[in-house]
Amino acid sequence: MNQKNGNGLNSIKKIISKCCNTDNFDISEQKNDKDVLIFKICSNEVLNIDLDKLCAQDFYICFEKCTIKILRLSEKKIKINLNLFFNSCSFEEIEIYNVYFLGQFKISELVDTLEKIKDIKFNHCAFNNLILEKNKFENNICFEEKTKIKKIYLYENEFKKHFFIKKCFIGSINLWKNEFKNRCYFMDSKFGYDEDENKKAKLNFSNARFQDNVYFNNSHFYDYVDFHECEFEKITCFYGVKFYKTPNFSACYFKEPKAVNLINVDIDKLDFKSVEKYIEDNYKDESYKNETKGMQDKKEFFKIKNKHKLRYAKNLKDSFRVIKDVLITQNNTLEAQEWHKLELYAKEKENHINLSVKDREKNADIFKNILIWFNCVLLNVYRNTSDHHNDFLKILNFTVGMIVLYGVFIFFCQACIEPYSKFFNELKSSVIFIIIGILVFLCWIMFYFNRKKSIFAKSIFFIIAMVFIVLYLVTYFYKTNEYKTIL
């Protein structure tokens, strides 16, 4: 039944009467701020809602200041098209099995005045849009057994008992500003989407406060998950968690760092490219959009763009540092080194962004510019030659390469330079001028190199230039006794 076809209060009342098996309720209609017609139900009785009798309906219904009981344990799967809202209600019992809610399902401003309160359970259910807003739950909240939720939005709730998500599929979750006074479980579940990147899942746990133990055991996070400014006061368990994209733990507070379990956390998917992608995918936030709205000045636009990129790079660096410090507190230096490597990735990207900003500034501090450039090149070289001392194969390849290169230098000296030794001896007086010329040339390359965006190209050129200097010094000192001793 569609409200657009002229559903009146009487027809809606008959539907609700059959659904709740009572006529003792008041019904009214009103429009919300989006001009959508909502039917409000108020009653002093306990309304025992039969969801099977709502399958064919399609309208917005709000139970307000009612006592609700929903018990649906049938093996038969049903779909509910209508939008169900529960405002300022109390729940005697909710246990729902095998129901797919196509519309919105919302519980707000819950009032628990009952002496006996049972758990709120959803098993083998599916939700398109689930909202829990400004509630104080005295019940255990349980989502179990492959319940699928495309969007779950929890805002300013207080959970006095357990909050439980196990073996569920969560597309998007927003846990902003919730207070969990008892244990929380987000176990054996999948957050985000495995393959479909166009869904753009949002996994936001930020600003939540966990006063008791919280467990994320064996869960998979397929998209960016945001834990920034979360407070964890007791045991925090990430055992067996896998992050497919870069997580954000910036400004997280762990009251007991030694109570944080990071055993078997899988971050193999995280590398320098994932750090770059995180910044590119996230810097265009609401603040960025507000600042650049209607802007025509390209220079100012570029400045704001890099300011926000820099902010996200710094936040990411702090995020990796937080986990690194926790692991160091636990004397787990091996795992801490992995997170330190990610921290250096973020630092390199921060320097890169800083460098692009300084390149465009007219009155930039040249000395500071040189330091940023040099740090950026060094981090790039370390990353590509040894992955910041974490990749033995890269270190071995680089070492073997240097030995081979040294052998080539020796061969070059013996085979090519010997016949021209007299000529080189005549150039001894001009050595200092040649070295100065090389340094000036390097400075010119640093400030006017066309491929400013390619730090890797600069690093390669830097290495080649250094090799050139070494070759010249080898040539110059070839005839001295000291060099012959080295050979």
Q: Which sequence ranges carry the predicted segments?
A:
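Terminal module of membrane-associated proteins
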Residues: M1-L487
